């Protein structure tokens, strides 16, 4: 069957590993503190999630509340040199900590096996730079998650998200003949934009990732009402970014792919 999904391109933190996407958020808070003794909140740290990490720090500096704190302390806005300094603090912290957040999210291993049984290739890309991915990839493999290909945010001269380049590099590496036969899966808006810009179907994850922003343990004990409110908040952001589908976690992906395959068979395209 030619007219079906041939590849999925998966994000990492909050999508396949690190439920709630905590590895990067906590490190941003620590890097701001370490480099300039400026406090940011976890909620603020989550706002630009999905961008490359230098661009993420730049976006944090432009948040009105963070800019106000910066102005109060330094009588100016954040500069490129400031971003470099925070990034320099961020990198060793992230490299050291990322292995602690490398366990696959519940359902990921079984889902990957089911997709591979259907002949679907598993691509991946991340807002993490290569130095971090070189630690994360083998750690995740040790836990049983090993995609067919991965691309880091600083691998390509053209750049990272929300541009299409990391997703398209997966298409090239995996030998996929049509972007309409690919699905980009992500828990943050820039990754949905990436998939759309690459001409792919896009699936947002509303519970496992950054926008929901809870640990697995917290999620397990959360009231149904709280889950519903958080899910709606996350889903609305992902749909606003243009996601074709939004589900809770990667475990829900096979059902979505069956739906997309039916649409492809009828001649639909993303």
UniProtKB/Swiss-Prot annotation:
Reactions this protein catalyses: phosphonoacetaldehyde + H2O = acetaldehyde + phosphate + H(+)
Cofactor(s) required, per the database record: Mg(2+)
Annotated EC: 3.11.1.1
GO cellular-component term (any): cytosol
GO molecular function, one term: magnesium ion binding
Cofactor binding, per record: Binds 1 Mg(2+) ion per subunit.
Assembly notes: Homodimer.
Official protein name in the record: Phosphonoacetaldehyde hydrolase
Top-level taxonomy: Bacteria, Pseudomonadati, Pseudomonadota, Gammaproteobacteria, Enterobacterales
